[in-house]
């Protein structure tokens, strides 16, 4: 018997799995090609992901998905994305010069920014001092937003409240 190469994409099915697949085809389910990932989100926000799933569609429009479901670790994926952004931060897009303004306009912009910063505190700074109601928010979510956006707890809680506890949108709003 010949060996299967380690990097090949071969699936070996048990006898019971072969029977189940034959029954699925007899039910009229059609295989859907080209699906690389399927995710499911539960009510409590937990996300399950199936990489390289086998997807079938019924005549009624329902889908049947086979594959190994894993809990999707969003924080790990977010950290990887931020790491890649930081690595590419110093790289300018092709065709863009490092200096897009003349020196006088840059100095004028810097002076205007310095003047506005010393004149009055921003509205966001007032949020830092005030206590924000954290009821209905998950403490882990607040900590994650604080860590990823680099903001104080009050700002993180306020952003989560404004975005209905959506971590991604809260981080994007604070980072932008």
From Swiss-Prot:
Which intervals hold domain UBA? 137-176
Q: Does the keyword DNA-binding apply?
A: no
Q: Where is this region: Disordered?
A: 85-127
**Origin: domain of life:** Eukaryota
**Which Gene Ontology CC terms are recorded?**
nascent polypeptide-associated complex; nucleus
Q: Where in the cell is it found?
A: Cytoplasm; Nucleus
Mind listing the GO biological process terms from this record? protein transport
Q: Which Gene3D superfamilies match?
A: DNA helicase RuvA subunit, C-terminal domain, Nascent polypeptide-associated complex domain
Q: What region holds the NAC-A/B domain? A: 14-78
What keywords would UniProt list here?
Cytoplasm, Nucleus, Protein transport, Transport
Record's keyword annotation contains Cytoplasm: yes
Q: Please name the PROSITE patterns in this protein's record.
A: NAC_AB
Subunit relationships: Part of the nascent polypeptide-associated complex (NAC), consisting of EGD2 and EGD1. NAC associates with ribosomes via EGD1.
Give the family this protein belongs to, as stated in its UniProt record: Belongs to the NAC-alpha family.
Q: Function, please?
A: Component of the nascent polypeptide-associated complex (NAC), a dynamic component of the ribosomal exit tunnel, protecting the emerging polypeptides from interaction with other cytoplasmic proteins to ensure appropriate nascent protein targeting. The NAC complex also promotes mitochondrial protein import by enhancing productive ribosome interactions with the outer mitochondrial membrane and blocks the inappropriate interaction of ribosomes translating non-secretory nascent polypeptides with translocation sites in the membrane of the endoplasmic reticulum.
Q: Which PANTHER family match?
A: NASCENT POLYPEPTIDE ASSOCIATED COMPLEX ALPHA SUBUNIT-RELATED
Write the protein's name: Nascent polypeptide-associated complex subunit alpha
The top of its lineage is:
Eukaryota, Fungi, Dikarya, Ascomycota, Saccharomycotina
């Amino acid at each position: 018997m010949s060996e299967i190469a380690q990097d090949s994409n071969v699936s070996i099915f048990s006898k019971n799995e072969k029977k189940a697949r034959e029954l699925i085809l007899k039910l009229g389910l059609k295989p859907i090609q080209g699906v690389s990932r399927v995710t499911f989100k539960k009510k409590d926000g937990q996300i399950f992901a199936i990489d390289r799933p086998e997807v079938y569609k019924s005549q009624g429009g329902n889908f049947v998905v086979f594959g190994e479901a894993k809990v999707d670790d969003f924080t790990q994926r977010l950290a990887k994305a931020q790491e890649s952004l930081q690595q590419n931060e110093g790289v300018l897009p092709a065709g863009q010069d490092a200096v897009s303004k003349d020196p006088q306009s840059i100095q004028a912009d810097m002076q205007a920014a310095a003047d506005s910063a010393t004149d009055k505190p921003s509205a966001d700074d007032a949020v830092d001092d005030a206590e924000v109601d954290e009821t209905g928010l998950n403490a882990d979510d607040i900590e994650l937003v604080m860590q990823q956006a680099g903001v104080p707890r009050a700002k993180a809680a306020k952003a989560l409240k404004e975005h209905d506890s959506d971590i991604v949108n809260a981080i994007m709003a604070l980072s932008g």
